[in-house]
Amino acid sequence: LNDLLGELNSSHQGFSSFGDEEEVQYAASTMETGILFTDEDPYKVKSIVARSAADMKEVEILPGDELVKVDGIAVDKHTDRSYYFTHPSLDREVKLTFSRKGQPFEVELHPQSFLGDDLYDAWIDDNRRRVTEKSKGRIAYTCMKNMGTQELEHFIVDMTQELNGKDGLILDLRYNTGGNVHDEVLKFLSQRSYLQWKYRGGQLTTQGNFTPADKPIVLLINEQSLSDAEMTSAGFKALKLGKIIGNETYHWIIFTSGAGLVDGSFVRLPSWGCYTLDGKDIEATGVTPDIKVINTFEDKINGRDPQVDKAVEEVLSEIKK
C-alpha cells in the first residue's frame, strides 16, 4: 500500500499497521560507542564523538589507541568491525580492551542504539568554531535540527546567549527534518529596534531586548532541508530578512491529518498545501537560495564547508556597509 501511495508523488503520506505483516523475521542492534576509527586501520581510534558513551568515561580513549578485544574476544583485523558490535538486542554494557604503546587497558561502556544526534551536535560545534574563527568572534551561529517545540526553545535560548555583542547572525537549517514552529522562528528573527530607553545615569539601550533584524542575517539551507524548514526558508525570503545561501531545499512540504481504519491501521492524509504569496506550490518548487553553493563529498571528507565559508563572507560584507 505504501508503494501505491508513493505513485501519487505527494509527501508526508503513509500507511502503517500493527498486524503480523509488520513483524520482521530478524532484528539486530548496533552497539554504538561514539568511537570513530581511521579509514586506513579499522581498529585504530581516530577520535571520540563529544557527549557520546565513550566521552563519558573516566578512562580516556585517545587517537591512536588500538582496539584489541571486545567483551574479552580478540578481534581479527581481517573481520568487519561491525561483526563485534551487532547483536540481536542492545547490550547493557560492553567491555573494550585497547592497546596504547603496547600496554593494554580496559574500558566498560553503556552502548547507545543511535549516534546520529551526537554526530549532528558535533557537526554544529565544528560549524560554530569555524564561524567564530573566520569572523574573529563577530558573527553568531545557531542551528536548528528540526522545527519542534524543544528545538524552538533551544533556538531562543541560543539567540539570547550567542547574538548579544555580535554584529551578525548565521541561522543553519541544513539537514533540518521539519516540524511546525516556522511562525515563531520568523517572528523572533523579524524583531527590530523601535525605541531607546535608559535608567537614570545609565546608557541608552534599545527596545526590544532581542532584535536580530537590526543585524545582517544569512540563512543556510541544503538539499536535505525539508518540511517546515522549507516553510521557514520561504517565509525568510518573503520577509526579506537576509540572504539565503546553500542548495535548493528538498521539495517535501505538506501538512497532514490522519485517519484510523477499522482494522487498527492508520493512514496519513495530505491536508494543507503550502504556497508562496504569488501562488507557487512550495512542494513543487522548493526554496532556491540567493547564492547557490554546493558542498561536495570531497569537501565533507576533507573537513571543508564552502557554504559556511560563503555565509561568513556575506555577513562580513554586510557589516562593512
How does the language model describe each region?
Residues 1-4, 308:
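Short, well-structured alpha-helical segments that form the helix of a local strand-helix-strand
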Residues 60:
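Peptidyl-prolyl cis-trans isomerase
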Residues 241-245, 251-300:
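C-terminal structured "cap/appendage" subdomains that terminate the fold
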Residues 18-19, 23, 44-57, 68, ...:
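Cleft-lining beta-strand/loop regions that shape enzyme active-site pockets
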Residues 3, 7-51, 55-57:
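PDZ/PDZ-like peptide-tail recognition elements
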Residues 11, 164-166, 196, 275-321:
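In a subset of proteins, long, contiguous C-terminal domains/tails are tracked
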Residues 64:
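Conserved catalytic motifs of ABC-family nucleotide-binding domains
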